[in-house]
Amino acid sequence: MSYLRASRTSSNLSLAKKPSKTRKKLQARKEWDSSVNDLTVFRATNEELEHRREIHRSKNQWLARWELQNKANYKQSEKENSTQFENSRLALMKEILSDQYLMNDVLERSDRALAVVKDLFGDAPRRHTGFPNVTMAPSCDLETSRAPIVRKKDPPTQLSILSESVMDSQAINEVDKSLSRSEYSDSEAEVSISIQPNMKAERVQQLLTGEGPKSEAFITPHKSEGDPSQTQCALNATTAVNRVKVRRTEEESPKPEESDSIIGRVLNPHGKANKRISLKGKKKRTTNQSQTKDFSTFKASERDLTTSNQSSLGLLNSMIMEVEQDLAEYERQTGREVLSAPPAHGLTGFTLSLVSSLKRVVSYLKESDLLLQREVRERQNLQGELVEQRLMLDALTAEILSLKEGGNIHENHSQTKQCPEVDGDKLTSITQEAKTFPGLNGETCRTSADCGLSKVNQFMDSQDVQDTDEKHSRLGVSKDEFGARLYPQGRPAEEPRLASALPSHVFQQAVLLSPPRQKTVGNLSSHSAVPKRAANRLPSPPADLMTAPVEIEWPESKLFQRSINYKNTAALIERGTMVPGQENSKHVYSSAQGSERVNQHPTESTKEVQGLEIGESQINPLQNEDLVSQMQQLALQNAALKAQLEQIHFSPEGNAPEEAAAEQLHNPEPATDTPARAALVPVSLEMRIAELNRQSAEARNKLLKLIEQQKQSIVVSPTLSPITPQGRRTGSSLDTTPLSSCSTSGRRSSGASNKSESISTSVGSLRSASTGRRSQAANDRGEGWFALSAHIS
């Protein structure tokens, strides 16, 4: 296709129609506007402009402004947060990568230190690499031929020796030069071969391991460093080769030493601070010094280093040996197995010994800590058990003391149960003496147990006067009548009046002014043996009096009157035993009568108790001495009556001579009225005998009642002793001691115990007069214990 337009022919042009021309219509001209020159008419006013602004103002203007403000604030906060986040991120990265940074710093410092330490002693040989250009023979076999260049090993330096001593423990002791040379030549020979680049690594290895050491014996040179151009140059040492060698030497950087030399320098830092010099100056100095050194100076420096190193290691070894000896001694003391460590040589052996010793010490510390904890636990357990055992011991001690106290009380009560049953004839003189002391009739016992014990003790100790009373009752002559015969001047009659003139509170119950002393069982048992003998020696009363019922009157209390049949009672007393049935019946009857009396006269017994308490606080020691003298005189009178009555014998045929003699003794007057008096003497004697028998029976009955009441009080409610085993009466024991049974039995026998109290008091006075225990009474008064025995002894 062609882009050339074909020319039109003339024929075509002629045939074409010519376009017709259209005329434009002429527009009418507008009129001229003269206002064009003054356009201010069309200027908008301020109101129109404001209206236009209001019309075209956006409806979201405030929202858009708020969004823009928020965007600005967000960008600002984002910028602040980004800075904070960046700081925290950097801190975190530093914390994470700090170890790596520190490691890099340590490595850099170690590299710098190694660069300085490389030639610390200034005796390291300088190696200069040769560049051989050798034309090999055509028939040369590389496997059988020697290497073209064999670099001998460097002479030993101080640093290399130190490294070998660290790596090999036997190197320190090898000082011999020949051994050291052979050691270096055999074990640590370094062969440096410089061959052509096309030699294979296998061939080089074969040369190093096979033929090289066998064929060549390396000899340590006498000088540590020679002229590099003469000693270690290439075979074809041309000028170009020397220039290349010098350039490469300058370009080489200092290579670090081997690992063994580094370890040796770190472990033996002697002289490091004094010999640290820059690498340049050290190289220059060593170059100048090494040219003038000979082999002898090298040997001396080597020997000094060996001795100094050996001395430091020897010190460490000696110290570790001392530690091991201490550990062995400790093991022997504690009974453990002694572990003998092999002898350590060199620094490696020292480290091994140190680690093993530390391990043993740590194990022993752990074991001792465990033992200490176990001992602490055992001690705590033992302390708890000790507290429990102490509590148990305290409880057992309290129980034993209470049982002992109860046993003492029970034994005292059992002793009181064995009170002897005294015959009436024995009590005749006691009754007469009791009549002379009217102050004793109205008193009552505070507790039945105390009354019973005091009566039993007084009867037991009055055995020395019972013979006189026995003879008086057998003869039928009263002591008053017989005393009038012996003392016609009236002296014996005045002494009973003196006794009766004494106040009634003298013979009342004892007052406790200080803690009493507890008597032992032996004292009670010694006293209890006397009434048994006395009961066997008591004579029986007359048979005519035993069958006659007697009316007993109680003038002291005026509480009751009772008729007692003395036949059965005297028979029982004479046998010394009582039928169980009768004993129980008497026991019940007496207790019933005692309760009946208490119900009938409650105020009278209360008055008596109040009088007793008032009288106990008015005891005078001077009256005690008067009473003692009076009791002694009564004892003498009884002895005289006994001697006189033994001479009088009554018979139905001839009573006149004996009666006349008795009358003359009684009244020594002229014998004008002798026949009339002879007829009156038998009658008066019989009346007196009957009266004495009646009184003895009355006293016997009262004693039996007292014994029954004592048994009843023991059976019903045994009292608790207010006296502690140490012999001290505490205030709590005085307040809390139960006395219900004692007070009850005392109220039951308020009337019956008055007479018995007077009898027991008189018997106790006779006993004290016969024995004469003034020292015991003085001790009792000194201690504040004013018992009845203290008043009459």
Curated annotation (Swiss-Prot):
Organism (species): Xenopus laevis (African clawed frog)
Subcellular location: Cytoplasm, Cytoskeleton, Microtubule organizing center, Centrosome, Centriole; Cytoplasm, Cytoskeleton, Spindle
UniProt protein name: Spindle and centriole-associated protein 1
Biased composition annotated in UniProt, kind: Polar residues: 718-739, 754-778
One of the Pfam families matching this protein, by short name: SPICE
Record InterPro entries: SPICE1
Disulfide bonds: none
Taxonomic lineage: Eukaryota, Metazoa, Chordata, Craniata, Vertebrata
Coiled-coil segments on the chain, per record: 312-405, 622-712
The protein's role, per its UniProt record: Regulator required for centriole duplication.
Keyword Coiled coil among record annotations: yes
GO cellular component annotations of the record: centriole; centrosome; cytoplasm; spindle
Chain intervals with Low complexity compositional bias: 740-753
The UniProt record lists the keyword Coiled coil: yes
Signal peptide residue numbers: none
Amino acid composition bias (Basic residues), ranges on this chain: 18-27
GO biological process: cell division; metaphase chromosome alignment; mitotic spindle assembly; regulation of centriole replication
Region (Disordered), start-end ranges: 1-29, 519-542, 718-783
Keywords assigned by UniProt, alphabetized: Cell cycle, Cell division, Coiled coil, Cytoplasm, Cytoskeleton, Mitosis
